[in-house]
Amino acid sequence: MREDYSETGDAWNFFTHDHARSRAYRWGEDGIAGISDDKQKLCFALALWNGKDAILKERLFGLTNSQGNHGEDVKEYYFYLDSTPTHSYMKYLYKYPQAAFPYADLVETNHRRTRDEMEYELLDTGVFNDDRYFDVFVEYAKDDAEDILVRITAFNRGPEAAELHLLPTLWFRNDWATWIAESNRAPEQPNLRQIKAAAGTVAVAATHRLLGEFTFSCEGEVPLLFTDNTTNNDRLFPGQ
């Protein structure tokens, strides 16, 4: 279940997983191994792509209450491995198949099963056969109250080389759109921009009227991709 602002209160079906990648959230965000400030204005999470999926793996996949034979159910394998009481250190593991993620198979097979049958799990689909998956570890360590170090480590558990793209993602929750009530709307849109960085690194300045400015930097002179966190109306609501 995601956000619901439908006229009928159909919380399970109003905001689908297919819509999630193209639709700006109003009240909360999701992501793999994600963190944010306490108001969830500035967010960070990991996206991945195995070269086989039709979409980026930006969030966990699960069945809604009507799709699962035992109700709502996440169909992924992820583990919170470690954390200090203050969250000054956290460690997370996500297991990402090297084959195309079987979204349709999970939905269709579970929908056909009765409540008396076993659930059809991701492992049952065969995508983990021969250990053809990646173990992706995400670690956070605080160097200071507002200085967080991030380490992402991926291991290929399969018998052969396989493609994997790691896409660390920094974004602002959309609180400036015109569909937000004026009393809750941010007076101006925050900004992400590339700035000059030390040799062998790239850096982004994240500027928000309430939060101030933060710097996001990473090792390697890797390409940066910038997008606006807005709803893709042409894809979701063509002709409207």
Residue spans for each PLM region:
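Anionic coordination/interaction segments
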Residues: 1-240
